[in-house]
């Protein structure tokens, strides 16, 4: 039906988009800490945000502009979340946006996104002083992805070209950041998606919601939902091409790649784990069980220790509130079945095989509840000493 090819460029891959990262002095040692994404052509933007009741100022500012609106520029800063800053947080954004528009009159409804420490005013003067370094049209997507990092171990970007059977094509690119305070109730930490596909304005939000459901909504690092979670989609229609099935597939691929990168990059994490739950009474029940596994500290520390302690998995499912029965439950590490509908298969040989699975950097734990047909896969990681160190020293 259509072909999907990985390409370079991240958010700059689609036609008409540019991005860069600059150093505004927010991070130490002159590191990149402010980024922008810009569309040369008129663009529409739609976004989904955190369900945290204390949503940060950039989110409250954005929400005042509507569900889908004209916008060709986003400014992103690290080190400061601009959260719990009240009316002054909004005023600081308005102050910066006015100066941006004065410097670059072609900008339409520029918006802002922030990540970092909660409870401190935005260092707007430092950011304003760095605006002179912005060069619209610069295609430095990798630098932009680096600039938005906080405790991330690596930058996260991806891009695809989609070719339709008639030879027409469009591109989609994205970047994300996130490693800690990840348990999105709708998005991720920060994710910015660009496309030159001619996405209908009235379809943008629904397609975003569909793709988020099985990607960013399916990950957890530490069970905490940020005040700043944002996933933002820009469409500038530059290709003039759109086919909904192909676009949704590409959007899901982009989000899946970035979501699993975020889970893999859990602060100090060494392992990415897919928690596959099947046989639940409904998809909602499967989601509840899978997410309980991603956030269980006992499960996460067992993964860190490469200990196939299946009892912790059973206990977590049993306390998750879903319908379950120990005489129907099956638990596997990879393809190694350790518990089968009331029968304990966990002898020394099975334990070593299961431990061998857990020594891999990426593996799955499968739980068949044996109740119905509901299924869902959530992604998580281990939790070890480094997580405590990173977060204990976060503000130093």
UniProtKB/Swiss-Prot annotation:
Disulfide bonds: none annotated. SUPFAM superfamilies: DmpA/ArgJ-like. Its EC number is 2.3.1.35, 2.3.1.1. It is an enzyme of class 2 (transferase). Substrate binds at residues 150, 177, 188, 267, 391, 396. The record marks 187-188 as: Cleavage. The active site is at residue 188. Keywords: Acyltransferase, Amino-acid biosynthesis, Arginine biosynthesis, Autocatalytic cleavage, Cytoplasm, Multifunctional enzyme, Transferase. It catalyses: N(2)-acetyl-L-ornithine + L-glutamate = N-acetyl-L-glutamate + L-ornithine; L-glutamate + acetyl-CoA = N-acetyl-L-glutamate + CoA + H(+). The record marks 115-116 as: Involved in the stabilization of negative charge on the oxyanion by the formation of the oxyanion hole. GO terms for biological process: L-arginine biosynthetic process; ornithine biosynthetic process. GO terms for cellular component: cytoplasm. It is found in: Cytoplasm. Pathway: Amino-acid biosynthesis; L-arginine biosynthesis; L-ornithine and N-acetyl-L-glutamate from L-glutamate and N(2)-acetyl-L-ornithine (cyclic): step 1/1; Amino-acid biosynthesis; L-arginine biosynthesis; N(2)-acetyl-L-ornithine from L-glutamate: step 1/4. GO terms for molecular function: glutamate N-acetyltransferase activity; L-glutamate N-acetyltransferase activity. It comes from the Bacteria. Its main location: cytoplasm. Belongs to the ArgJ family. Heterotetramer of two alpha and two beta chains. Catalyzes two activities which are involved in the cyclic version of arginine biosynthesis: the synthesis of N-acetylglutamate from glutamate and acetyl-CoA as the acetyl donor, and of ornithine by transacetylation between N(2)-acetylornithine and glutamate. This is Arginine biosynthesis bifunctional protein ArgJ. The gene is argJ.
